[in-house]
Regions:
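Amphipathic alpha-helical linker/stalk segments
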Residues: 1, 61-87, 139-141
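Basic, helix-initiating cap at the start of DNA-binding domains
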Residues: 1-37, 54
Length: 196
């Protein structure tokens, strides 16, 4: 029972941290304020996480596991390159829309002054998505379906830049500009420019 309670408390801490990041836009989250929001002492927080960086790391891991397991499902279910790209874009944007506090972490908004390892993790997160898109585009070049009309690296870079820009705009607008807003029209324009 103690192990389950530990897991539940860890989960509670992470959920409250994500909620506090959403509510306190532009403000740093201290371990003291987080402990107060969770309803425990700072010492209790440190029994579950060695540092605030470890809490951020746990939320980054959650994001990676969620996104990449769903990307794998998309790849298993869809063969068309344009559908794969569209669904991956929508997946990342809608995940962020549902998790605004976590979005602040993955775009680095709350990582100023934090451990460089955290910055590397979020950079790697976007690099993995870009790499996956690049692989999809390479495979498309070998198929009879739609193919990228330009340099694969340039197309993958443009798609990941679009995603990062939408997430940044979401945070900078105090979460009022939803990442999925206008996605159908924007993807239609991008698709026409990227594929033949």
């Amino acid at each position: 029972m103690s192990g389950r309670r530990q897991l539940n408390r860890r989960q509670q801490i992470l959920e409250v941290l994500a909620s506090e990041l959403e509510k306190n836009l532009g403000l740093p989250i201290t371990t003291s304020s987080l402990a107060n929001a969770v309803g425990v002492s700072e010492a209790a927080l440190y029994r579950h996480f060695a540092s605030k960086a470890k809490m951020f790391e746990a939320l980054i891991s959650f994001t990676e596991e969620s996104i990449f397991s769903l990307i794998n499902k998309i790849l298993d279910q869809e063969a068309d390159v344009t559908v794969r790209c569209e669904k991956i874009i929508y997946l990342v944007l809608s995940f962020s829309e549902r998790n605004p506090g976590i979005t602040r972490i993955i775009i680095g908004d709350v990582l100023l002054g934090e451990n460089e390892r955290l910055h590397a993790r979020v950079t790697q997160f976007f690099e993995r998505i870009e790499s996956q898109i690049r692989q999809i585009l390479r495979e498309a070049n070998l198929s009879n379906g739609p193919r990228p009309i330009s340099n694969i690296d340039a197309v993958a870079d443009q798609i990941i830049t679009y995603i990062e820009g939408k997430l940044s705009k979401f945070v900078k607008s105090s979460f009022s500009k939803k990442p999925t807003e206008h996605i159908e029209v924007q993807w239609s324009v991008m698709k026409a420019g990227y594929f033949r």
